[in-house]
Amino acid sequence: SGVKTNIGIVGLDEDARRGDCASTAGNQVFTALELAEIAGLSTGIVTNTRITHATPAATYAKSVDRDWENPSVMPAAAIAAGCEDIASQLINFERNLEARYPGIDVDGIEVALGGGRREFLPNDPAANSQDARSSVEGDRNDSRNLVEEWAALYPRGDYVIDQVGFDAVDAATSENLFGLFNESEMH
């Protein structure tokens, strides 16, 4: 965004206070990704870290704590105050941007590729991916499966977890691509 901010927060200016949900209001900054989206351009995020890590998250999220990647690491008071975890903000980017700036109509992020699958899946072995390395891959304690939510929002999109899935994507018919290639960072 190019705007002065404080250590430990994402997508907010220096008037936001770490851990204080109330300080989010009025302190959101425009990001280059948001400006491109509003201009009608295709947008994307590609990283080799967790896609919810502070650096990639700064393109799409507004959080008073860079560590709030899923609700299991958020204080109950923050959740009760309406703070949204970073993974959920990625899935809800289109809706959140349109709500923040009434009158705009965007089509959402076309490409999001990285690691951090655990931030999007519920803490339930039934939600594990085919290549899960942990007995329980997801960390979310709110029972939400954000991969399924993304698929419902973008039915003409593709979700991939590996090279085989990525190579099988038909760019001529796929409108969105969401790839989470590891539970955490990609090594």
What are these regions (language model features)?
Residues 1-187:
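Surface-exposed loop and adjacent secondary-structure segments within mature catalytic domains
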